[in-house]
Each structure stands twice: as C-alpha cells, then as structure tokens.
C-alpha cells in the first residue's frame, strides 16, 4: 500500500475570465473546485494508475469536509486527522493567457492535533510499503516535522518519497534519517545549494549530487521540465529523454511524476522502467485539463517513447 501525506491541503478554485477588470465586479460561469495540495494530486494519479493508495494529512471545517466528500465520490480511501481550523482555499484566475493566484496561508495545527496525526500515521505505516510526502507544512507544524515522519517510516522499513522544497527539504537532508527518493526540480536544487546550473547543467548537477548532504538517499530525480530529467541511483547516473508533447495544463505534473515513481516502486520496477513510469505520468498529467489526473492508456503510450540512458561514470 502507498500512503500519501498532505499536511497543507486546499480547495483549488479556478475562475476563467475573458478579461480581469480591477476595482470592479468580474462575473464568470466557468468555475472549477477540486481537492488540492501536492499530495492529493499524487493520490489521484496513483488511483488513476490502479495503485493501492490511501490519503492522509489534516482537514478542517467545511472546506475539509468538501475535500473528504470529493475523495469519497472518487472511491479514494482516506484517513485524515480532523483539525479545528478551516482548510484553506487556493484561487487561480485565468485571464488573457495569464494566471493570477491568491493563496491563503491556511490553518494553524495545534499540538494536540499534531499528536493525533502522528498516532494515525503510526498505524497507517504498519500496513504500508511506500509513503509519499508532498508540499508545504501548515502553520503550527515544526520545521523538522517531515524528518520525524521519515524517521517513523524508517522504523517500519517503509520507503519515503519526499517532494518538498526550501527549509523543509533542507531539514530532512541535514537530519540522520534520509528519504528513499527526492525529486527537486533544477530551480529548487539551485536554491538549495546556492548555485547556478545554467551553464552545462548536466555536468553541474552530477557534481552537485555527490555532495555529502545527499549521502544515504537511494534515488535523486532532478526534473528538467520538457527536457526530461537527470537521476542518480546509488552511484549510477541516468539521463531521461522525453518526446515533445502538446501540453494543456502542466500544473501538477511534478506531483504526477512522484505518483508514477511510487507506482513503479510498488511494482518493483527496475531502474529504467521506474524512471519511465515517473516521466510518463508527468507527461500524461500535462495533457489533461484537470490537475492531478492521467489517462492510463496515454501513460502506457508514453512509456514506449521515453529513453533512459546510463551516464558513464
């Protein structure tokens, strides 16, 4: 079983406008509301692929109830911890080819609610093979919270796929317990290391991933967007090349990549096939209008067209 963790979920609300007018009323009938947050995107894609998945995290108020109900309608198993404060909204206004976002900070999780979640997490990982941890931390959660989840998973011999950035990622990398896989994109890696990889990025990334902070992480997958990825498994590097596609909505493609990687791991896929599952799911997500969804037949089609090449040491 794969457990997905989303500690700061949201309702993603999208408004489509012909023109955004300031300081007046804007009306639209084209509105979508979906359960959001990186971990829930991962959840939906694993479910679309046919994987055995259960979603956990924290949900509160009417917004939390909406998310829980939407997952129930999609037949996605869930085991969230209830919190007192309201789960946030994330608003995207699509206008004139642009996207203007309004993102709420979200709820504050109390110490008692943190304890309740950790008890729930302890029970879930007893049944799990893989845990995915995605996105930001809600207010009230300590900056080393993900390190604690990784430690708990290690104790149960559960593989952790971590997709976060900034201080949350840095805290885990500096800690004694390492995730099984991380997937920063090139920009996030540059921010983490304070380096510029614009010149000769392939060689620069290879050198960077041998730094001591990455020791003990079995898989590091660096997303290069339309240029594919560079990956490191133990001491072996891989270059992943993907075909050009017509993207409809690239939002959530990184989350879909994590979902594909988790699904491949659950299938005990060998290295090259594992990377193909990740890239194929990310590509298929970009071809859907709805974030965090894939067409399985499209994923399988992409699997045939992705090249994975070992980079000579």
Swiss-Prot record:
Fetch the Gene3D superfamilies from UniProt.
Answer: 3.40.1190.20
Q: Which UniProt keywords apply?
A: ATP-binding, Kinase, Lactose metabolism, Nucleotide-binding, Transferase
EC identifiers of the protein: 2.7.1.144
Pathway the protein takes part in: Carbohydrate metabolism; D-tagatose 6-phosphate degradation; D-glyceraldehyde 3-phosphate and glycerone phosphate from D-tagatose 6-phosphate: step 1/2
Q: Name one GO cellular component term.
A: cytosol
> Cross-referenced InterPro entries, in alphabetical order?
Carboh/pur_kinase_PfkB_CS, LacC, PfkB_dom, Ribokinase-like, Tagatose/fructose_Pkinase
Q: Which GO terms describe its biological process?
A: D-tagatose 6-phosphate catabolic process; lactose catabolic process via tagatose-6-phosphate
What's the catalysed reaction? D-tagatofuranose 6-phosphate + ATP = D-tagatofuranose 1,6-bisphosphate + ADP + H(+)
A Pfam family (short name) is PfkB
One Gene Ontology molecular-function label? tagatose-6-phosphate kinase activity
The entry's family comment says: Belongs to the carbohydrate kinase PfkB family. LacC subfamily.
PANTHER family hit by this protein: 1-PHOSPHOFRUCTOKINASE (PTHR46566:SF5), 1-PHOSPHOFRUCTOKINASE-RELATED (PTHR46566)
Q: What is this protein called?
A: Tagatose-6-phosphate kinase
Q: Which organism is it from?
A: Enterococcus faecalis (strain ATCC 700802 / V583)
- Gene responsible for this protein: lacC
